[in-house]
Amino acid sequence: MSKLGSLVRERILILDGAMGTMIQQYNLTEGDFRGERFSQIPGQMKGNNDLLCLTRPDVIQDIHRKYLAAGADIIETNTFSSTRVSMADYHVQDYVREMNLAAVRLARKVADEFTSLTPDKPRFVAGSVGPTNKTCSMSPDVNNPAFRALSYDELADAYREQMEALLEGGVDALLIETIFDTLNAKAAIFAAGQAMETVGVHVPLMLSVTVSDIGGRTLSGQTLDAFLASVQHADIFSVGLNCSFGAHQLKPFLEQLAARAPYYISAYPNAGLPNSLGTYDQTPADMAHEVKEYIHEGLVNIIGGCCGTTDAYIAEYSSLIAGATPHQPVPRPENLWLSGLELLEVKPENNFVNVGERCNVAGSRKFLRLINEKKYDEALSIARRQVEDGAQVIDINMDDGLLDARTEMTTFLHLIASEPEIARVPVMIDSSKWEVIVAGLKCLQGKSIVNSISLKEGEDKFLEHARTVKRYGAAAVVMAFDEKGQADTYERKIEVCERAYRLLVDKAGFNPHDIIFDPNVLAVATGMDEHNNYAVDFIRAAGWIRKNLPGAHVSGGVSNLSFSFRGNNYIREAMHAVFLYYAIREGMDMGIVNPAASVLYTDIPADILERIEDVVLNRRPDAAERLIETAERLKAEAEAAKTSGGERQAAAHSQLAWREGTSVEERLKYALTKGIGDYLEEDLAEALKLYPKAVSIIEGPLMAGMNHVGDLFGAGKMFLPQVVKTARTMKRAVAILQPVIESEKEEGATAAGKVLLATVKGDVHDIGKNIVSVVMACNGYEIIDLGVMVPAETIVQHAIEEKVDMIGLSGLITPSLDEMVHVAIELEKAGLDVPLLIGGATTSPLHTALKIAPVYHAPVIHLKDASQNATVAAKLMNPKTKEELEEELHEKYRQLCEKNREKQVTTVSLEEARKNKLNLF
């Protein structure tokens, strides 16, 4: 471990402040920047601060000395813009190596002087590596979104040139800072690895990102969680935040980073926010007061300053950190992290990750035609529709003999980057050509999936590909394929997968969670007996992999299974539903599917289900013949209807059978479950005649339908794309009822109370919250809806400003649980006394009792669904019933906590366990 590495564990370290702000105090002229040496170079040179390392080294050395005298442990080299890319603007790009070497020499000399004076307080030099003035993720031309002013390779080469000089000069660490585009940062990380190998020196790698807005995203659109996933492959020493805001505004994002990043945490905020003249008014004492919270709450290991800060600001830190406990990094995630603009964390409770299959020129004739004809807008609409239908990852394949696959992959990925609705999900780069995969990896700022690598060409090529995937920061699909060919039996599948796993983990240093095995979904019912057990072998292999290869995932191209039934979409989709039902139960947690598929396992008629299961599970020797008979019968019935001119009528009759002889409640439930919105107006009009108020329909049959969907999803009989369709249908139903709800409100009626609603930060799901909003409004409450992805500080701010009577927090995903706890803590800190209503798919009474209620003194109530909100709210608005409710909650939560404690396994020390060992002899 480096000296820097051991010291950061012992105490909080101080980083220096702004270089540019300090330089401004010297009132340097154009002549100072140019010196005699650069007097003939065209253009203005003033403002090129890095050049001062060559023309006014005395100034730079003096600034370093002031920061070290102020107490800094780490000073940065004056090389923020010292790359060939940035220096080209000043026509001095050919001097970047000399500039970097000079910058290190200046910083190193002063740092070593101070270390010799105080050996117990060693001083370090970090090589500053800025983001450059170009971006790899965005086009500078709004009319050409596929264009890039700079390629990944050009940027990586420029970074490597800079870093080699910094390492040769003797820096103690490399600091890639002010990251606004994660793809730029990934190029810098890639270059850092190359530079360290070339120079033969390995130093800690520090990253510092900057957020561009109060939503906490980078300029290129990523959330902080997505950023962490994108750089997870790197050997990171620290990660942090700089620039953007002052210490107060930066704190919520720092808290998020500290809670999620398994690294040391750094922060160097600006001196507050700039005034109208672009200067900073915050005093050193005021900034120190805000930074003090970072230190007291254990958020940081390294603290410094950015824009507007000087040595006077840094001098305030020594007294703040004296005796303070440094931040303890959180454990590394035990799940697969993927990202586009947002994080996709693949957890067991995710059930199944849908990889959209339609952006594949080999599998979609329509997509191939659009790419061939350069109709990229229409091709993008296919990707967008898949995301809307619930695809959590988008598979992209451009392998066609008449296409330049590398160019098309690059173009399409560049175009996706300009479409936030698509770019928010991770990408699976799918190609049989390695150069196409590498080209794709250079286009994506998020953490993608490579599809695929295998042992087909032997171990050496396999390891070479695996190391390349890792270096670019991606996960990998590993095909069950080796030198002998495709693994088609259970025994061969587990043999190849185990061998590949050991090579990846033991020799390539691959994160086990980034390994996604594809044990080969092969066609069944082909008429060849040796194919009959293909599905069973896959399902068994999936179970074996999940039990025996820790961390690894299982995926597959599901449509391959039903290849024998091309042309019969119903049978194919039904086969897929059956296969997934059994494969997911065994451990398959990802698959390339059509997210718009509509056949549910539970809706397959019993006779057809039996025959499909006979085939998929290989339960009888004549299974294929029997399913073929069924498929032919269905086809013949369709042909007969067509011949008699009644095809459309027959199809319509079949599709509308659910509407015959059923109650309006049953029809609404079915419509929600299937995501059918065509008859909502008709059915809701009928329901309005039966129910006293429109809100009663929401609380009754519509809520019953939503609960049924939840049950199916939880049982693995319904998947996310279908749930998304349900949510859209529910929104449409509520929108239809909304005018009626408004008209039913009594004129002049005063509000029963004021309710603030929000889906917590990190969660984009709003269907549950929207239903609660409607129900509460119908019951006379004034609603303040803050929307989705709402930070804790925004909730606190609006709760105070609006003087609300209660706050409702919603969340659908697991990370929302931790964020709800965080919101409760912030409400408590702010001194609020407002009841907190908790709801959402992942919430529970037990989590509320154990985690949320203990950190907030006001009532915290978990609500199962929207129908309970109005009743509970009414009790909270009445002082007498509120007191009774609080007593009920206290007793209920006490019992829940007690039962939970009884379930916990009591552990003993290792020494005591050894004393209790079973003695057989």
Can you say where each PLM-predicted feature lies in the sequence?
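Domain-level signal for soluble alpha/beta catalytic cores
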Residues: M1-F921
